[in-house]
Regions:
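Short hydrophobic targeting helices and cationic amphipathic motifs
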Residues: 1-4
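A short aromatic-anchored loop/beta-hairpin motif
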Residues: 13-117
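Short, basic/glycine-rich phosphate-binding loops at helix/coil junctions
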Residues: 24-25, 81-88, 136-145, 218
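Internal, conserved structured core segments that host functional sites
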Residues: 103-157
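Surface-exposed, charge/polar-rich loops and edge strands
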Residues: 108, 112, 143-144, 151-173, ...
Length: 275
């Protein structure tokens, strides 16, 4: 289809009054996630229980760019942003339609309060986006737009999420994609056990989410046990704050729940849903 035809199809789809979509934060693993005996099934079961989205807005830990950037609005090649893996991981395809109407909605929601927005039309989906989407929406028939993390400041990211929250009432699934603990220097081999810092941070985060203790989550580096062991940098926890903002603005923090838990190579794969 031509760009103009894709735009018309997407606009019509988003004009249908849908139910409010949840907001998700998921741990996306790495390309070998597809070979795990359990994790792909957990992601597939999760998506099977969701309302069908009109479009998906992805915020991945693997794209930091300021000002906030909108990725491709038509199908372009994936970004294989990893090195040293077997060749078949570089042949994974996920040709989801672009989401130009969603991109325009994002521009309006963010620019109205004066937030600068830029377009990066050749930027495809990175592995933080497509690895989980392959398992959750394998037909690649839902339009997807990826946006960048414009900052790693948790409060500013929550504000971005709050501004994007109205999209949930237009059938848009907002997904923050990171990893609940992420310290690659301490990665364990399969079956190598779970390091204490990863288990402690995961338990703390689970309790903070259950208690809706947003202040503690915002200050995770100091409020949590082993915060900087769990996250030497903030980028894999950062997408959670966009999700929290989208949930908070819609009054859905009380409706949060963990959907996936456990560990993968010593890292916590906790994933949560609001609404």
């Amino acid at each position: 289809l031509k760009f103009q035809e894709l735009w018309k199809v997407e606009v019509v789809a988003m004009q249908v009054t849908p139910e409010r979509m949840p907001a998700l934060y998921l741990s996306h693993g790495a390309p070998p996630l597809a070979d795990d005996p359990v994790w792909p099934g957990e992601l597939a079961a999760w998506s099977a229980g969701l309302p069908r989205p009109k479009a998906i807005l992805m915020v991945s830990a693997h794209w930091e760019e300021a000002p906030l950037a909108l990725g491709a609005t038509e199908t372009v090649p994936l970004v294989y942003d990893f090195w040293g893996f077997p060749e078949h991981y570089y042949r994974v395809a996920y040709a989801a339609p672009g989401a130009p109407a969603l991109a325009e909605s994002v521009r309006k929601l963010l620019r109205a309060p004066g937030t600068p927005v830029q377009d990066v039309p050749d930027r495809g989906l990175d592995h933080g986006a497509y690895v989980p989407l392959v398992e959750m929406f394998p037909d690649a028939d839902v339009p997807v737009l990826q946006i960048s993390l414009p900052t790693l400041d948790p409060r500013r990211l929550m504000d971005v999420g709050r501004r994007l929250a109205p999209l949930r009432d237009e059938g848009v699934l907002i997904v923050g994609s990171g990893f609940f603990t992420h310290n690659l220097a301490a990665l364990r081999h399969p079956g190598g056990g779970v390091p204490g810092w990863s288990a402690e941070f995961d338990a703390w985060g689970h309790e903070a989410l259950a208690a809706r203790d947003v202040d503690a989550l915002l200050d995770f580096a100091h409020a949590s046990p082993a915060g900087r062991l769990a996250h030497p940098r903030t980028e894999h926890f950062a997408p959670l704050f966009v999700t929290l903002g989208a949930a908070d603005a819609a009054g859905d923090l009380d409706a949060g729940r963990s959907v996936i838990d456990g560990f993968w190579m010593g890292l916590a794969k906790r994933s949560v849903q609001f609404g």
